[in-house]
Amino acid sequence: MKKTVLSGVQATGSLHLGNYLGSIRNWVKMQEEYNCFFFLADLHAITVDIKPSELNNSIMGVLAVYLAAGLNPDKVTIFAQSMVKEHAELAWLLNCVTPLGWLKRMTQFKDKAGSDQEKACLGLFSYPVLMAADILIYKADIVPVGEDQKQHLELTRDIAGVINRRFDKEILKVPEVLISETGTRIMSLRDGLKKMSKSDISDFSRINLKDDNDLIHQKIKKAKTDHLSFVSYDKETRPEISNLLDIYRSLSEESLEKIINNYQNQGFSKFKEDLAEIIITNLQPIRDKYLELMNDKEYLLKILHKGAEKARIRASETVNEVKEQFGFVI
């Protein structure tokens, strides 16, 4: 029996190279080996201020990227979180057993809420509980995530343990966390100490998957390096050039040693020019397919509804099992 994999991307903004290398490319490989559920986290998206039209476009855009990158809806279950109401239902049940102190320790809330946490919405504070519900509802064996989500996954495991101990029965599966080594954390092109992000105010901090070839060349040409004139890898002292090398090796699948040797006497100009071409070679087919899919909204909606229908079968079983243990009438 195949193990179950669950993961998703928040439906806000445009997906970028970091999303592709850190998540989606790995999912495409996993779909042949596992029973996969990949969702669009649109309920998570409204924990921050977002216009209705922007949310709608983001949902369709993320789905189009999933498909353009190679996820096959005949092999995996792809759905929007909001279309499976059981996610919110299980999240409430989990909220009722999750200690407040656990949530207060979550570092991402502090980062996203900023200096005035009193004005942040409750949804942002309890975001990790909904994330736990997203995972536990499908009894996922494996959850591939980035390093920045590791704390939330540990909370998910703790919440599953609370439920199982409370009812003295293994109702919820405690998932394993999968964090890949290379490509899992691509950094900003403007600051090698910050993760590449959709929310960064500077568009030149990231390579969006729908960027055209000229824009990719411009962004890589202007990507921050340092005062040294040679290519070398050291994340501590040279974070920006090390980030560009991580992108290069992730897309070319060449070793760091080989890449560095190739540019030993050529400086940054040639390295950046070649890196831009490697990015274009990898992303252009995805971009072309993405644009084609975005012109067929009817097909995209069909995929979402089909996936949600399939996901709800598994989700409703888990929710009913948990509700029964609480004492609700099923």
UniProtKB/Swiss-Prot annotation:
Its EC number is 6.1.1.2. It is an enzyme of class 6 (ligase). A motif ('KMSKS' region) lies at residues 195-199. Catalyzes the attachment of tryptophan to tRNA(Trp). GO terms for molecular function: ATP binding; tryptophan-tRNA ligase activity. Belongs to the class-I aminoacyl-tRNA synthetase family. It comes from the Bacteria. L-tryptophan binds at D134. A motif ('HIGH' region) lies at residues 11-19. This is Tryptophan--tRNA ligase. Transmembrane segments: none annotated. Keywords: Aminoacyl-tRNA synthetase, ATP-binding, Cytoplasm, Ligase, Nucleotide-binding, Protein biosynthesis. It comes from Rickettsia felis (strain ATCC VR-1525 / URRWXCal2). One of its GO terms (cellular component) is cytoplasm. It is found in: Cytoplasm.
